[in-house]
A protein has these predicted regions:
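Short glycine-enriched loops at secondary-structure junctions
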Residues: 13-16, 191-196, 242
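Short acidic/His/Gly/Ser-rich catalytic and metal-binding motifs that mark active-site loops
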Residues: 17-21, 196-202, 247-249
């Protein structure tokens, strides 16, 4: 969202979920423990309106649970709480997240009635084996069918996928990304698996039946799928869980939790491009690479990891990264001697 657009989050932790996915503890992940009420909605909107500049376009967002799976009366109460603010222009629309198996024509008609603009579907994977091992309770076809229904009904569609779930491989994650691209969503969220306390996945990890999906693993596979989404022109609106006090305070006990995961992935992608560019370069050379101003830190890498890895891999005397006038994401060999 631009500076004159804002999202007002209201969390409905774990409401509506018919079963517990192995990775999920929404109260710890979202940092919210109390269910949303009409007053929660009113307070969130009024606080946001008071703090945001005049002319800001605000969208109310119901996150953290399967919104369309909660009782219709509860959905209606939350929508009705927002209605006066829609009517007077304080907010422009609503977005919500839900499960693919909680979407049907009647539900979508209700969402239209209450000015919902954006529907986020938690696909997580489009591999049936991974969905089953993760106790998702739905199939890949149900994800695809729900996504098509949402698009055909005129909503903006966001699809969420995870990496490193039980049974996942780099190949299955890439295949999920390709299937998501075929559905033509308006954006995607990518959430590498984090091991959170008080989840079945935590117990599986402790018992040795689940192998941790590390930050390094996530960076590797997310670099592959990010490239696919970039090439398809599908925006990635979030990569990795948002930091919360609970997660940062120790509830994230393993897995791919990093507050700047997206930056690490983009840095890895720049490294991979540099490796291709330098392929065949003789050893003992001095190399100068040029990148866009916005990519200098990504190309150098955290603690100069990319620069030092390139220097070591190609046995260079030195490597220097410079700002130059090229497009973001591109790399140019400026000097080789």
């Amino acid at each position: 969202m631009t500076a004159r657009n804002s999202i007002i989050p209201v969390f409905v932790p774990h409401l509506g979920c018919p079963n517990d996915c192995v990775f999920c503890n929404q109260r710890r992940i979202s940092g919210h423990t109390e269910p949303a009420t009409a007053q929660t909605v009113k307070t969130a909107i009024e606080n946001a309106a008071a703090l945001s500049p005049k002319g800001t376009k605000r969208q109310l967002a119901f996150y953290g649970g399967s919104f369309t799976a909660i009782p219709v009366a509860e959905q209606t109460a939350l929508f009705e709480a927002a209605k006066p603010y829609l009517d007077d222009g304080t907010i422009s629309s609503i977005r919500l997240s839900t499960r693919p198996d909680a979407i049907d024509a009647k539900t979508l008609a209700r969402l239209k009635k209450y000015s919902v603009q954006t529907v986020e579907l938690g696909a997580q994977s489009l591999c049936d084996k991974v969905l089953w091992l993760s106790n998702r309770g739905h199939t890949a076809k149900e994800v695809e069918d729900a996504a098509i229904m949402v698009k055909q009904a005129g909503f903006e569609l966001i699809l969420q996928m995870m990496t490193g779930l039980p049974g996942d491989t780099d190949e299955s994650c890439v295949e999920t990304a390709k299937k998501i691209i075929a559905l033509r969503p308006d954006g995607v969220r990518i959430y590498p698996t984090v091991i959170v306390r008080d989840t079945e996945l935590y117990d599986m990890w402790k018992a040795g039946t689940y192998k941790e999906h590390t930050v390094s693993d996530a960076v590797r596979v997310c670099a592959k799928i990010t490239k696919l989404f970039d090439e398809a022109g599908i925006p990635i609106i979030r990569m990795g869980l948002n930091p919360t006090e609970d997660l940062s305070g120790g509830d994230a006990v393993g897995g791919a939790y990093h507050p700047a995961l997206g930056e690490l992935v983009r840095s890895r992608m720049m490294f991979d491009k540099a490796v291709k560019l330098l392929d065949g370069v003789e050893s003992d050379k001095r190399v100068v690479l040029g990148v866009n101003k916005s990519d200098v830190s990504k190309m150098i890498g955290q603690h100069r990891c990319n620069a030092e890895a390139l220097k070591s891999q190609f046995k260079l005397k030195s490597i220097k990264i410079m700002q130059t006038d090229i497009n973001s994401g591109e790399i140019k060999l400026l000097s080789l001697d």
